[in-house]
Amino acid sequence: MSTRNVRILAFAGSSRAGSYNVRLLAHAVELLRARGADVDVLDLGALDLPLYYADDEAAHGAPAGVQRLREAMRANDALLIASPEYNCFFTPLLKNAIDWASRPDSGQPSPFAGKFAALLAASPGALGGVRGLPALRILLSNLGVLVLPGQLAVPLAHEAFADDGSLRDARLEKTLGEVVGALLTAFKPA
């Protein structure tokens, strides 16, 4: 029986220059790759997705960026998502991408089907973006994703990162290692 590494699609709910969530995601990706995972990183902002509008979809179909997102999701076994919190919710960029990806696609299986996911957040606030993660967890679960129970929210993110990209707080660094480790062990590819 052949085995392969788990394939993980990683993306952030922010495309802001200097995004703390992009930094957190990059560090998590390093940890995953060091443990043997194949990780694809996708910049949601680069997909240039229009705001989802059913009439536009009916008239013109899904834009090319939506197809790229769906293909990337289908090519991977698991998702690693880092999202800031906007008004106690995850970002509009992330919500719009999920809305587009979840639309029916010419008889293709849902790109969310059978996926595992791990969630991360970082914020300059004291709560680290944790208030946005429950809504993201519910949405992904409703789409058939098994969202792992462990998660990480990094508070005071403007002070949280060392020069090498790691987290200065050893407890947060340990939790991040546990979250990515759980994602690797949750999916056992054949």
Ranges and model annotations:
Residues I8, N21, L25, V66, ...:
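A general structural signal for well-ordered alpha-helical segments in protein cores
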Residues R7-S14, A118-A121, G165:
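Short beta-strand segments enriched in small/hydrophobic residues
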Residues S2-N5, L9, L146-A190:
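Glycine-rich phosphate/pyrophosphate-binding loop and the adjoining helix
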Residues G61-L143:
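Helix-loop-strand module that forms the ligand-binding subsite of alpha/beta enzymes
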Residues S2-A37:
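N-terminal beta1-alpha1 ligand-phosphate binding loop
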Residues L44-G61, A160-D164:
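N-terminal beta-loop-helix "entrance" segment that forms/cooperates
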